[in-house]
Design a protein with these regions (language model features):
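Membrane-interface helix termini and inter-helical loops of multi-pass transporters
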Residues: 95-105
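Interfacial "cap-and-anchor" motif at the non-cytosolic start of specific transmembrane alpha-helices
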Residues: 26, 140-212
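Individual alpha-helical transmembrane segments in multi-pass integral membrane proteins
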Residues: 4-92, 106-125, 152, 170-184
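Juxtamembrane membrane-water interface segments of multi-pass membrane proteins
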Residues: 1-5, 61-71, 129-146, 193-206
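Hydrophobic membrane-targeting alpha-helices
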Residues: 24-28, 59, 63, 129-133, ...
């Protein structure tokens, strides 16, 4: 990515990759027991993955040359609410367990269903938008959106399958999902970024309107 000129799109791609790397790093720290307490690493990891869905939605809008509006604003708003909850609520994350292939997190019962709806909901929205917009666009935008959609499906399909087959794996959904996120990271780096560099139209930026 260092070869490419930084645009709104490449900044979003870099942000997604950094957050994925942060979560992978926190898993290593949790199970390696380095420096910080496990609860601190859990909060850092959950904070990182909570910010991923709105960034993906925002990226889809820019790749499709759509102006980010209420949907993107709502995605960011919901992510900030969950981010604040996991960062500051005392009992939001009470512990973790390390397994061979993933980590489970003990989260407050009241947050499990809302957070699952939040995460899967925005992933489905992103998949739907990329599927709906891609066929109507020229080749570079189409290729980038289809690559992003493939990345979404790489998260949704394996994770959903695992949790259906092994109900006890539900607590490990964030860890399992980010295990498959290497596919998304590869697509962002090798396909979405190169295709986005070929785009000629001006990208829409995203700004919140202040009431003053």
């Amino acid at each position: 990515l260092w070869r490419y000129k930084f645009t709104a799109i490449t900044r979003l791609i870099v942000s997604l990759l950094v957050l994925l790397a942060v979560f992978q790093g926190t898993e290593f720290m949790l199970c390696g027991g380095l420096a910080l307490e496990g609860g601190t690493w859990s909060k850092i990891g959950y904070g990182a993955i909570t910010l991923l869905p709105p960034l993906g939605i925002h990226l889809a809008y820019l790749l499709a040359n759509k102006k980010p509006g209420k949907v993107v604003a709502f995605a960011y708003t919901t992510s900030v609410l969950f981010f604040a909850y996991f960062a500051f609520a005392t009992q939001a994350i009470s512990g973790h367990t390390c397994y061979a292939n993933y980590v489970t997190f003990n989260t407050a019962n009241g947050s499990t269903i809302p957070y699952t709806i939040y995460y899967y909901g925005w992933l489905f929205v992103g998949t739907f938008l990329t599927y709906m917009w891609a066929p109507t666009l020229h080749k570079h935008r189409k290729a980038a959106l289809y690559a992003l959609m493939t990345g979404y499906l790489a998260l949704l399909i394996p994770t959903t399958t695992v949790t259906i087959l092994w109900n006890e794996a539900i607590a490990g959904i964030p860890s399992i999902m980010c295990g498959f996120a290497v596919i998304l990271a590869g697509l962002l780096t090798l396909k979405v970024a190169p295709e986005s560099i070929k785009l000629k139209k001006t990208h829409h930026s995203f700004h919140f309107k202040l009431p003053f």
